[in-house]
UniProtKB/Swiss-Prot annotation:
Stated family: Belongs to the bacterial ribosomal protein bL9 family.
Pfam family, one: Ribosomal_L9_N
Annotated function: Binds to the 23S rRNA.
Species lineage: Bacteria, Pseudomonadati, Pseudomonadota, Alphaproteobacteria, Hyphomicrobiales
SUPFAM superfamilies noted in UniProt: L9 N-domain-like, Ribosomal protein L9 C-domain
Domain of life: Bacteria
Keywords: Ribonucleoprotein, Ribosomal protein, RNA-binding, rRNA-binding
One GO BP: translation
Gene Ontology CC, one term: ribosome
Protein name: Large ribosomal subunit protein bL9
Source organism (scientific name): Bartonella bacilliformis (strain ATCC 35685 / KC583 / Herrer 020/F12,63)
GO MF term set: rRNA binding; structural constituent of ribosome
Length: 179
């Protein structure tokens, strides 16, 4: 099916491009989400009349994403999870967990904006890419640790492997609450 793109889509094209995609992709995703129009004469004329509005809206969204990116780029977030002695997590850190942590910090991020190449299954520092807009990508660091104390050590030492961090945390005496 030939479609006219109403916004920039990765690996597909820019605003106004006429591209050919599979029928299901167009019918089930691009057309219902308002990201494209069928490429017929009426829609081509409609697009040409609306082109300036669409480009202005895209520029506005891009500027908004860049403002968020300036505040969020390079920031780090702490995730506390239980893990074994080798640093292997009991489970994994998913895009839902990352979305919740970033949202608790006051940012509005959707799960589909997070790009995880592989699930996070070990403690340590993990870079994660956020796609705020098709033209705006940033990187944040996820600190996965067993406790807040261990996360603080990871931030201070950033070079420590998960096993070394484990040894340091185990060597420190536990603070007892004497009431």
């Amino acid at each position: 099916m030939d479609i006219i793109l109403l916004e920039r889509i990765n690996r597909l094209g820019q605003i106004g491009d006429i591209v050919s995609v599979k029928d299901g992709y167009a019918r089930n995703f691009l057309l219902p989400k308002g990201k494209a129009l069928r490429a017929n004469e009426a829609n081509k004329k409609f697009f040409e009349t609306q082109r300036i509005k669409l480009e202005a809206r895209n520029l506005e969204c891009k500027n908004e994403a860049q403002k968020i990116a300036e505040r969020l780029n390079g920031k780090s977030f702490i995730v506390v999870r239980s893990a074994g002695e080798t640093g292997q997590l009991y489970g994994s850190v998913s895009t839902r967990d990352i979305t919740d942590i970033i949202t608790m910090d006051g940012f509005s991020i959707e799960r589909n904006q997070i790009e995880l190449n592989h699930p996070i299954k070990t403690i340590g520092l993990h870079p994660v890419t956020l796609n705020l807009h098709p033209e705006v990508q940033i990187s944040v660091t996820i600190h996965v640790a067993r406790s807040a104390n261990e996360a603080q050590l990871q931030e201070e030492a950033k070079i420590l492997t998960s096993v070394e961090a484990t040894e340091i945390v185990q060597e420190q005496p536990l603070e007892e609450n004497i009431g």
